[in-house]
Amino acid sequence: MKLLVIGNGGREHALAWKLAQSSKVETVFVAPGNAGTAIEPKLQNIALTAHQDLIDFCRNENIAFTVVGPEAPLAAGVVNDFRAAGLKIFGPTQYAAQLESSKDFAKAFMAKYNIPTAQYQTFENADAAHNYVNRKGAPIVIKADGLAAGKGVIVAMTLDEAHAAIDDMLLGNKMGNAGARVVIEDFLQGEEASFIVMVDGNHVLPMATSQDHKRLLDDDKGPNTGGMGAYSPAPVVTPDVYERAMNEIILPTVAGMKAEGHEFTGFLYAGLMIDKNGAPYTIEFNCRFGDPETQPIMSRLNSDLVDLVEAAIDGKLDSVAAEWNPQTAVGVVLAAQNYPDSPKKGDVISGLDKANQIGKVFHAGTATNEKGEVVTNGGRVLCVVGLGDDVAQAKSKAYEALETIRFDGMQYRKDIADKAINR
């Protein structure tokens, strides 16, 4: 069979790579893909992004099903368009994707269905937002309502930072339309985890747990990013936390969407904050697999991903199970110079073959120049994954592979997975 994956990041490289491991698969097309998907066995890039062009391609190539990687096409209704054309696709509808594309929608939904999350209020007026923050005090969290590539959240430790974030979004147009409304919520303390499941509208199949590292610099310093590394499994998600996350967050969300008349299908990602008592709170929802969490999670999946996606599309997720490698996977992101503000592009990358002999390199912001060299082409450039019998071994493997790679201005965190090692 032939499949299509929409997107061009590390998440899409990992999903396409895992789908291609199925004996049922002849080719996985990636639209538009990157320099890594261009050379991966059984993968083929296609330079298409418009929904109608993708629909025509799927019809002409007899594509069995499509998996959507990033949030932007979901928010733009790609699932609705494919379904209207009678094509199989795994992802949420435009309405359901509002759980990610509008923070205000998600918070109102959580309030309605009693899903644990931080107290909040939404503002379009800067003066009202400033007054609210003055009343609440710091630390406090300011979020752009719309999609901002993981960079629309400011954890303000002081009132000055909070007021500056409000002005940037509501008056300075720093986030464009995404920041025309802001959600201001209480600061939650605890340890974060990524809880990702597959949903077919009614049934839920949990993926392996993971923990992301959002901040640019070691010790969780610096600005928020799309994610600088992740590991799986996440020890903070104990069996008790797992049970509570399923019963208090995931299942009520799936039931709530159904009650709204919009069944949720696709990957559902709950970003959790787990407090000192082991109570999980929802920081955010994403309507797709996380990036970089996908890379370590897919590195541990022993099951045929094609079988799981087919079951989900057919509404039969209750008939399949996911088998996992008991090893730990650690993924470390290599970012371009000046990321996250204005990443430098076009720098030649060396050492990829050697790195792939030690671990697995998933490409994100990469392209090929006219000489055929792999070059930087985005903020987060690569994610290097190492597997090991414990977290320390997996971390060591990932960094051993990473150290063979070179490009100008390369930046990465040196403490990915240390929280798990130091537990």
Regions found by a protein language model. Give the residues of each.
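Generic C-terminus detector
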Residues: T366-K371, V375-R423
